[in-house]
Amino acid sequence: MQEIESLHQSVLLQEVLQAFMPLEEGVLIDCTLGLGGHSKALLSQKPHLKLIGIDKDKFAQEIAKERLKAFEGRYNLLSGGFAKRFKEALETHNKEIKGVLVDLGVSSLQLDDDNRGFNFHSHTLDMRMDLESELNAQKVINSYPIVALEKIFRDYGEIKEYKKIAHKIAERRAKKPFKNAKDLSEFLSSFSKNKKIHPATLVFQAVRIEVNSELEELKEFLQCARNLKGAILCVISFHSLEDALVKNAFKDYAKNCICDPSSFKCACSNNHALGEILTKKPITPSPEEIKNNRRSRSAKMRVFQFKP
């Protein structure tokens, strides 16, 4: 456990604590519990706060449970997709919910585990957050039609040469299927010459998003979150696709006028805002945090306060 404490660094921890500073009691939902770093800090700082922690990864949840031992009786941990579980919690605890945290990053424990398939040197081609899910990265890479590969590389990886990469992968797998992440990473490096980032980075991102339905789950969550009353919502994203969804959802929440944009005059009373955006610009890690935890460098945090 001491090793976990030293290896695991919660992204934007002080900024998250600051965002939830107004909370004194009630329920906080950590939609992406992970190893429980943010939740542990919040429960420590807020003695009257209760926690609902959600995560797909049962292994990570067991570690989080151990780390939260000191707060026995103040938390309830749930397994499953956060959109579905959040909706259920909202139906039963709406008036009690005072804060909601979503950290969309992959934990260091998952990234560094060569058996999970998230890193370029992994012995598997998996990438599942939920190890009971049927779809994994190997099925995507070795079985998806070329058109489907093109779509996920274009839409989820924002890869310019999405057609070329999809066709190259199809040619190679016809001769010899990809057996692990290392195999795929080395193959991509053999013909892609991107100097700014590792040639496999965006392909791995796209496949991971597909395997875990990440953007669909985020969209479902953001739609459901509209029903929050008096709560603070804090979302940490790690790439432009996630951040755009969060940014646009928050703008939509904050709209007073819901008339058709083509209308010449407002006829809706201009009082429909669900609350206010507390972060005019996203909060990003300090240079010091990036120095200590390089994986935090792309993090962006946005915060919204819902009306009671």
Swiss-Prot record:
Catalytic activity: cytidine(1402) in 16S rRNA + S-adenosyl-L-methionine = N(4)-methylcytidine(1402) in 16S rRNA + S-adenosyl-L-homocysteine + H(+)
Location relative to the cell: Cytoplasm
UniProt keyword annotation of Cytoplasm present: yes
InterPro entries linked: RsmH (IPR002903), SAM-dep_MeTrfase_MraW_recog (IPR023397), SAM-dependent_MTases_sf (IPR029063)
EC number: 2.1.1.199
Pfam families hit by this protein: Methyltransf_5
Cellular component per GO, a single term: cytoplasm
GO molecular function: rRNA (cytosine-N4-)-methyltransferase activity
Record keywords: Cytoplasm, Methyltransferase, rRNA processing, S-adenosyl-L-methionine, Transferase
List of residues binding S-adenosyl-L-methionine: G36, G37, H38, D55, F82, D103, Q110
Enzyme class label: transferase
An annotated GO BP: rRNA base methylation
Family to which the UniProt record says this protein belongs: Belongs to the methyltransferase superfamily. RsmH family.
Function text: Specifically methylates the N4 position of cytidine in position 1402 (C1402) of 16S rRNA.
Protein name: Ribosomal RNA small subunit methyltransferase H
